[in-house]
Regions:
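Detector for the c-type heme attachment site
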Residues: 67-70
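N-terminal pre-ligand scaffold of iron-sulfur
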Residues: 1-61, 72-73, 77, 86-105
Length: 105
């Protein structure tokens, strides 16, 4: 695993997500308050990107805008159908106003 800079803290608004490509992997980088979450940017239901979806800061989830599958940002576990398989998650850290993601090398 290797730490890769994903974005500046200011690039990710609270209760939102952006898409980034890190080491050849599409990653959904989401923010809830001062916490950042990274998960593979594809819904396990139909392989559509998750990053355009709605982030719920109270539940710490993201909802796929295509079919409504909801995933826990912390674990990648689906919270409702139609998705039944989790999506991979990656560890994040903030350093010097940048967000880093621990990615496979």
């Amino acid at each position: 695993m290797v730490w890769v800079r994903a974005a500046a803290v200011a690039e990710v608004a609270d209760a939102s997500a952006i898409d980034v490509e890190l080491n050849g992997v599409r990653v959904c980088l989401a923010r809830v308050g001062d916490e950042f979450y990274a998960l593979q940017d594809n819904c396990s239901h139909r392989d559509f990107p998750l990053s355009p979806g709605e982030v719920d800061p109270d539940e710490c989830t993201i909802t796929c805008e295509w079919h409504g599958a909801m995933f826990d940002l912390r674990t990648g576990v689906p919270q409702c159908p139609p998705a039944v398989r989790p999506v991979p998650v990656f560890t994040t850290r903030v350093e010097n106003d940048s967000v880093f993601v621990d990615m496979p090398d």
